[in-house]
């Protein structure tokens, strides 16, 4: 139901025009991506997350050989788009690590997207040069009071830094910005 009382005929015409415009712009394609976890190191203390800094788990950050081995398996599966993920640990998987990893794999993929800790505009610009196409940022809640409860320590505790990430991505010129909650 809509606010404007469209007729069934008018709605079908709009739907047809919309479909045509979408196909003209994007073609008849569906794009799949595959995730690759580069690191589970994390400096945050999010109460809901298995990567929580306090959790006593085996921590791993992939080295060059491990990254390439994973990428070769992924390519055999036919994927052209990859999502690189890490815990939020600038010490273990900061901009230098991500830049290097992207340079290692960029010739394997049409698109590289990240789901990592929020960064500065300059850091995102560096990563664009290394092949960054998109970034996904998840905001677990928009309620500032609840956010503080869920994120008691670590960089992620800074609500404003996190919520302003899409703005920094846009300023940096990142092509695709994905938001989730």
Predicted regions located by residue number:
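Canonical Radical SAM [4Fe-4S] cluster-binding loop centered on the CxxxCxxC motif
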Residues: 24-66
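Short, small-residue-biased leader/transition segments that mark boundaries at the very start
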Residues: 2-9
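Catalytic or ion-translocation cores adjacent to nucleophile or general acid/base/metal-coordination motifs
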Residues: 12
């Amino acid at each position: 139901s809509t606010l404007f009382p469209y007729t069934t005929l008018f709605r079908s015409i709009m739907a047809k025009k919309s479909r045509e415009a979408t196909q003209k712009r994007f073609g008849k394609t569906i794009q799949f991506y595959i995730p690759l976890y580069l690191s589970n190191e994390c400096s945050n203390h999010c109460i809901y997350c298995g990567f929580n800094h306090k959790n006593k788990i085996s921590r791993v950050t992939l080295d060059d050989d491990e990254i390439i081995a994973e990428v070769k398996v992924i390519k055999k599966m036919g994927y052209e788009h990859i999502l690189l993920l890490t815990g939020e640990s600038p010490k273990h998987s900061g901009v230098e690590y991500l830049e290097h990893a992207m340079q290692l794999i960029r010739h394997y993929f049409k698109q590289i997207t990240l789901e990592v800790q929020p960064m500065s505009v300059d850091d995102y610009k560096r990563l664009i040069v290394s092949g960054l196409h998109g970034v996904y940022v998840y905001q677990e809640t928009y309620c500032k009071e609840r956010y503080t409860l869920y994120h008691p320590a670590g960089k992620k505790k800074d609500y404003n830094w996190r919520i302003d990430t899409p703005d920094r991505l846009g300023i940096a010129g990142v092509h695709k910005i994905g938001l989730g909650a």
